[in-house]
């Protein structure tokens, strides 16, 4: 299965008639493995800040998580494994695997829990595969 199929079939999937706004799988060096057409253009320093928070949990909380110039307020996650952010009626979930970052961006009517489930389910699968 190609990385694009993972994005199309597993991240941009239909959940009760709703889907993520955007999704991507990035290498931990910030390279794009695959992304939805709607995924925002991001800066390398935004990915570097996300990776730093995985290594040193709590570093994003004071400043917020930025992706594509959009600021998300960092909310509870799982230290070293998952970062979650909120902005208005939407938000972001970032799951770290051994080699990649799985990113899902959502807005209503999709719920934070649905976004978490979509992103973390694929992330857990890739971890099981050694990726």
Curated annotation (Swiss-Prot):
SMART domains: PROF
Keywords, ordered alphabetically: Actin-binding, Allergen, Cytoplasm, Cytoskeleton
Annotated InterPro entries: PFN (IPR048278), PFN_euk (IPR005455), PFN_sf (IPR036140), Profilin_CS (IPR027310)
CC annotations in GO: cell cortex; cytoskeleton
Alphabetized SUPFAM superfamilies for the sequence: Profilin (actin-binding protein)
Localization per Swiss-Prot or TrEMBL: Cytoplasm, Cytoskeleton
Top-level lineage group: Eukaryota
Signal peptide: none
Key word Signal present: no
Principal location listed in the UniProt entry: cytoplasm
Molecular function as annotated in GO: actin monomer binding
Function text: Binds to actin and affects the structure of the cytoskeleton. At high concentrations, profilin prevents the polymerization of actin, whereas it enhances it at low concentrations. By binding to PIP2, it inhibits the formation of IP3 and DG.
Subunit structure as annotated in this protein's UniProt entry: Occurs in many kinds of cells as a complex with monomeric actin in a 1:1 ratio.
PANTHER family tied to this protein: PROFILIN (PTHR11604:SF59)
Similarity section: Belongs to the profilin family.
Identification of the protein by name: Profilin
Native source organism of the sequence: Prunus dulcis
